[in-house]
From Swiss-Prot:
Protein name as catalogued: Ribose-phosphate pyrophosphokinase
Subunit architecture: Homohexamer.
GO CC entries: cytoplasm; ribose phosphate diphosphokinase complex
The reaction(s) this protein catalyses: D-ribose 5-phosphate + ATP = 5-phospho-alpha-D-ribose 1-diphosphate + AMP + H(+)
């Protein structure tokens, strides 16, 4: 279901006029999210033609003058990631050549973020390559949400604003008034994320699932570090891809005596067989955001989808007005 519980902000982005020269455009990957962001900002999405030629090449044309404007292009690089990334690059290039004063690539989900380093010889660091492409296309700034690896910010030599979906998720969890919460990291690498999450939930205790990955998209869960018996376990991650890690973690938590298990993640990648794993009865709820569009065929009764449109809209407005973004997350 799409929950009405969203991150509540005191809207500063009201009464936009032509004099502000702020323009908002959407790629094809998540038009609904872009429309919600535009609604928060009290403006319309800019007109743009997007089409595909017979040979598969993409074409983009901005349908209004943006000369001297502060332009924001919303395009999560989700499946099909290569098409959506290429479309973003073309949009950025089109705006630069149209003499926009500043072009900001708003990337709610940054594709290729898991390829942030070499883990074996003769591999590409694709996250860095994507950063180079976006910069060379002409972007002046990037706004992204919940990067898989925070150090990706350092791959850019242009301003990079990194925002978090946790306020939206926390607002919803708080509204449920859950008791005896323990926040669980599905692996050692996510401990910092889970610890920050737990601190916002009245310093809830922390547990860690110790696992060792045998191959890509395959994880072997070994044991739980921490006490989860009789508690409401909240598994926290940045994304759910095939669901193998988080489902195996939930199964182990149940075996260790957890009373309830919730899953929270910003990005719902949901590659097969994620839906099958997540809807198998292991979770009370699977709570995600709408950074990536979720088709009806991938929805199931335990799924809760929260909107990050207000958060993104407020961030865009603050960038445009040169005001603080970090104060939103204190």
């Amino acid at each position: 279901m799409l929950s009405s519980a969203t991150f509540k902000l005191q809207p500063t982005a009201t009464g936009l006029t032509e004099n502000h020269r702020l323009r908002l455009f959407s790629g094809s990957s998540n038009v609904q999210l872009s429309q919600e962001v535009a609604r928060y900002l009290g403006m319309d999405l800019g007109p743009m033609i997007r089409k595909r030629f017979a040979d598969g090449e993409l074409y983009v044309q901005i349908q209004e003058s943006i000369r001297g404007c502060d332009v924001y292009l919303i395009q999560p690089c989700c499946q099909p990631v290569n098409d959506h990334l290429m479309e973003l690059l073309i949009m950025v290039d089109a705006c630069r050549r149209a003499s926009a004063r500043q072009v900001t690539a708003v990337i709610p989900y940054y594709g290729y973020a898991r390829a942030d380093r070499k883990t074996a010889g003769r591999e590409s660091i694709t996250a860095k390559l994507v950063a180079n492409l976006i910069t060379q296309a002409g972007a002046n700034r990037v706004l992204a949400m919940d990067l898989h690896a925070a150090q990706i910010q350092g791959y850019f030599d242009i301003p990079f604003d990194h925002v978090y979906g946790s306020p939206v998720l926390l607002d919803y969890l708080t509204s449920k008034q859950l008791h005896d919460i323990v926040v669980v990291s599905p692996d050692v690498g996510g401990v910092a994320r889970a610890r920050a999450f737990a601190k916002k939930l009245n310093d809830a205790p922390l547990a860690i699932i110790d696992k060792r990955r045998q191959a890509h998209n395959v994880a072997e869960v070994l044991n739980v570090i921490g006490d989860v018996k009789g508690k409401t376990a909240v598994l926290v991650d940045d994304m759910i891809d095939t669901g193998g890690t988080i489902a195996a973690g939930a199964k182990l938590l149940r075996e260790e005596g957890a009373r309830q298990v919730y899953a929270c993640a910003t990005h719902a990648v949901f590659s097969p067989p994620a839906v099958e794993r997540l809807s198998s009865g292991l979770f009370e709820e699977v709570i995600v955001t709408n950074t990536i569009p979720i088709p009806e065929s991938d929805r199931f009764p335990q799924l809760v989808v929260l909107s990050v449109a207000n958060l993104l809209g407020e961030t865009i407005w603050r960038i445009h007005e040169d005001t603080s973004i970090s104060s939103m997350f204190r």
